[in-house]
Amino acid sequence: MAKADFYETLGVSKTADEKELKSAFRKLAMKYHPDKNPDDADSERKFKEINEAYETLKDPQKRAAYDRFGHAAFENGGMGGGGGGFGGGGFANGGFSDIFEDIFGEMMGGGRARRSSGGRERGADLRYNMEITLEEAFTGKTAQIRVPTSITCDVCSGSGAKPGTQPKTCATCQGSGRVRAAQGFFSVERTCPTCHGRGQTISDPCGKCHGQGRVTEERSLSVNIPSGIEDGTRIRLQGEGEAGMRGGPAGDLYIFLSVRPHEFFQRDGADLYCTVPISMTTAALGGTFDVTTLDGTKSRVTVPEGTQPGKQFRLKGKGMPVLRSAQTGDLYIQIQIETPQKLSKRQRELLQEFEQLSSKENNPESTGFFARMKKFFDG
């Protein structure tokens, strides 16, 4: 089912500003919150849709991506192409906790500031999805990625104010970022509506970042993928996330790795498994075959006479490197015996002759099995 338009979900226009988005979200969140609608699946689903829409549209970077690409901007890892993708979902700090402080502050008569006035605010963490091959996981690699992120504005140095000017202490909250109001017997504290909790106002905003203190830019980064890395591994690049606000530290970038399934090898920890089909005659008479391993070398496997289906051969040290270790796993070759198809008349005659010449010693397992079965049912 197609996802609803985020603007329609919040009931705002595509030109809605931060204040309009926040107001719409607060009203809808109070209406559909699970605590007010227990055991109501539709309200719970609507509540999740509202959260997702607001989380996207309140962030200038995500909103720009959504306006350009729609929901596709956040699918399969989000923006980006090739072997990886970018998405900030799930990591951005802050979220809508400050909104709920206001909502439940009004309902319960309390609330606590999430950040101090004009305080340093840490940048959001970012996520980048990267797919690599099993060969790359075996050898390791250095990957170049491009990540769209928010960086500190170089014109205003992150203040958000036009060069030569400074942000001013908010006159409404006196720099605290919070305001109090009496409602009956309760004293309600909420985020300052003038400075939106920052404790400062900017009368003359920077022309480049428009008062945000940050601008969006695509950065190129080198990521070291160590040998032996496993599927699902998370790599943290400290300080490579979004820039902080008002001098706060940058967030982190998390690389989530997935290893593409291989055509021939399956992995279990440091060990590799490979199924090799051989002919019925090779299994019966014995023989040899070569296997090319992940390091590019060839290993010869000797098949003894009378090899049965499922027989495993172990090639020691031919598996995956153990991460940050000198150890290496093993490669296990499992035999699959291929039954002949589309026999010629002569081949059929020879097999029939072979069948007539066969004895119990040639097929001990099947002979013994049917004998045991007959004895079981005959009593």
Curated annotation (Swiss-Prot):
Reported impact of Y7A: Loss of function
Which residues are noted in the entry as Zn(2+) 2-binding?
A: C170, C173, C192, C195
Cited function: Participates actively in the response to hyperosmotic and heat shock by preventing the aggregation of stress-denatured proteins and by disaggregating proteins, also in an autonomous, DnaK-independent fashion. Unfolded proteins bind initially to DnaJ; upon interaction with the DnaJ-bound protein, DnaK hydrolyzes its bound ATP, resulting in the formation of a stable complex. GrpE releases ADP from DnaK; ATP binding to DnaK triggers the release of the substrate protein, thus completing the reaction cycle.
Q: Which SUPFAM superfamilies match?
A: Chaperone J-domain, DnaJ/Hsp40 cysteine-rich domain, HSP40/DnaJ peptide-binding domain
- Residues given in the record as Zn(2+) 1 binding sites: C153, C156, C206, C209
- State any GO BP term from the record: chaperone cofactor-dependent protein refolding
- Name the Pfam families for this protein: DnaJ (PF00226), DnaJ_C (PF01556), DnaJ_CXXCXGXG (PF00684)
Query: Which cellular component terms (GO) are annotated to the entry?
Result: cytoplasm
The record gives the effect of mutating D35E as:
Loss of ability to grow at 40 degrees Celsius
> What binding details are noted for the cofactor?
Binds 2 Zn(2+) ions per monomer.
Q: Where mainly located?
A: cytoplasm
Effect of altering K48T? Slight decrease in function
Q: What is this protein called?
A: Chaperone protein DnaJ
Enumerate the HAMAP family for this protein: DnaJ
Q: Does the keyword Disulfide bond apply?
A: no
Family as reported in the entry's similarity comment: Belongs to the DnaJ family.
Q: Zn fingers (CR-type): where?
A: 140-218
CXXCXGXG motif repeat copies, ranges: 153-160, 170-177, 192-199, 206-213
Identify the PROSITE patterns for this entry: DNAJ_1, DNAJ_2, ZF_CR
Species whose genome carries this gene: Rhizobium radiobacter
- Domain commentary: The J domain is necessary and sufficient to stimulate DnaK ATPase activity. Zinc center 1 plays an important role in the autonomous, DnaK-independent chaperone activity of DnaJ. Zinc center 2 is essential for interaction with DnaK and for DnaJ activity.
User: How does the annotation summarize its subunit structure?
Assistant: Homodimer.
Q: PANTHER family given for it?
A: CHAPERONE PROTEIN DNAJ, DNAJ HOMOLOG 1, MITOCHONDRIAL-RELATED
Q: Which UniProt keywords apply?
A: Chaperone, Cytoplasm, DNA replication, Metal-binding, Repeat, Stress response, Zinc, Zinc-finger
Please give the SMART domains that the UniProt record associates with this protein. Answer: DnaJ (SM00271)
